[in-house]
């Protein structure tokens, strides 16, 4: 489980992409491929910046789509990269990351990659409930992470097998626009450009969970874009900036199981 790529998702916001890529340059990374996926827009400024960007930690690949996919199709197309990688760390261009994000992502992926209960790994920790705008503070445990039945779009890891299970479900469900899925009333109202509502619905319908850190390794700058009409600051979460040792306390699922420290290989 060492074949993990960092994938940045861009459209027409060169300043946002620059901010994200500069945060990646400050991260604790030994060697990792970087893929910059750019949807078709009315400017080639983003493509020029991406092509000129120097990535010192390994291979860099720029994907430029010849037609406009739109946010939903663009994000879902990233899953195709899992034909070539064991996992991908997906970062939209309005995200920035903490220095330890990659070490955490790799360790969590190694630990949870064979757990069928897990649909993905979040780098972000919610400071509030974004449906009610009320404060949210997950009940602390002796571990570094917790489980929540909410998919993540503000910095997340997709693993090959869990993503394929989701995408097979998505292909069978997308045509009815979630009409047959109960208990997701607040997400059904999201527009058809949203891919996230399908991943959330999948977690609820199939009883899957995302792994969340108690301290964020990513934050959302919420720049003006497809789902944000003006720049926002409410989605920013404090980043875990202190140096993290390369050992994490991950609980097996469910929480009552014994603690297990991440090893070199995925569980068999």
Regions found by a protein language model. Name each.
Residues 1-91, 95-264, 268:
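Peripheral/terminal regions associated with large enzymatic or DNA-binding modules
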């Amino acid at each position: 489980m060492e074949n993990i790529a960092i994938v940045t998702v861009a459209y027409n916001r060169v300043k946002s992409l620059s901010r994200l890529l500069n945060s990646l340059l400050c991260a604790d990374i030994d060697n990792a491929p970087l893929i910059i996926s750019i949807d078709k827009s009315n400017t080639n400024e983003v493509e020029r910046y991406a092509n000129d960007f120097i990535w010192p930690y390994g291979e860099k690949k720029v994907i430029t789509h010849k037609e406009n996919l739109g946010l939903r199709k663009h994000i879902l197309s990233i899953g195709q990269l899992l034909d070539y990688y064991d996992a991908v760390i997906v970062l939209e261009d309005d995200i920035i990351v903490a220095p330890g994000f990659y070490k955490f992502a790799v360790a969590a992926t190694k630990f949870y990659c064979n757990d069928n209960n897990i649909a993905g790994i979040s780098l972000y920790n919610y400071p509030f409930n974004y449906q009610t705008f009320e404060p949210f503070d997950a009940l602390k445990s002796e571990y570094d992470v917790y489980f929540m039945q909410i998919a993540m779009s503000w910095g997340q890891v997709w693993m090959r097998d869990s993503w394929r299970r989701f995408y097979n479900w998505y292909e069978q469900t997308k045509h009815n626009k979630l009409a047959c899925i109960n208990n997701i009333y607040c997400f059904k109202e999201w527009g058809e450009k949203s891919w996230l509502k399908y991943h959330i619905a999948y977690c609820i319908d199939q009883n899957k969970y995302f792994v969340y850190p108690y301290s964020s390794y990513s934050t959302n700058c919420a720049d003006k874009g497809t789902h944000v009409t003006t720049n926002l600051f409410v989605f920013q979460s404090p980043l875990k900036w202190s140096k993290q040792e390369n050992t994490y306390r991950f609980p097996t699922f469910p929480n009552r199981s014994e603690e297990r420290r991440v090893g070199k290989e995925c569980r068999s």
